[in-house]
Amino acid sequence: MYISEIVEINNYRNLTGKIITFNDTLNFLIGENNIGKTNILELINICFAIGKFAETDFMDITLPIKIKFKVKYSNEEIGYFEDNFDVDDSNSITLVAMQDSVDERINYYHDTPNQTKISMATIRTMNILYYYAQRMPSKEVDFRKTSGSGKVLNYLIQHSL
């Protein structure tokens, strides 16, 4: 199972209006400073692990944050979201994560006219690994290390190639 696309981003930091497509195997976010790479990672972490946006995440605190994700999965994973799947592809679901105000939590639903609710418990069981952006990469991202970040990076490389 993987996030194939972030279809819609509304009112979240500097990413409003952006569409982000992901590869099913491995993705790299590369670019200049302050263009939103970390914001993309934090968006995924907030939606799939934390479940609540902070006041600083809202571009305009009078408007809700709305994020629309397309998640694809294998035949073996059919049923993970119970009877919910996209009509045009039974191996995918388009999820909406929406937080109406700073004081609330994110609500999740299947993007259909019925807006079938998806529980946070279901969302949290998806495998999301969040690795925080480093400020001193030369010291912290060292593939020679056998503990900490080096261990994680080596594991990801060995099991992804």
Language-model segments: what does each one mean?
Residues E8-N11, V71-N75, Q99-D100:
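Short acidic, glycine-rich loop/turn motifs
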Residues T25, I65-I67, N127:
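Core residues of folded domains in eukaryotic genome-function proteins
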Residues L41-S90:
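Conserved P-loop NTP-binding catalytic core
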Residues M1-I46:
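Pre-Walker A-like glycine/lysine-rich segment at the N-terminus of P-loop NTPase domains
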Residues N23, K70-S74, Q134:
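Solvent-exposed residues in well-ordered beta-strands and their adjoining turns
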Residues E55, N75-L161:
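Glycine-rich phosphate-binding loops of NTPases
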Residues I6, K66-K70, T94-V96:
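Beta-strand secondary-structure signal
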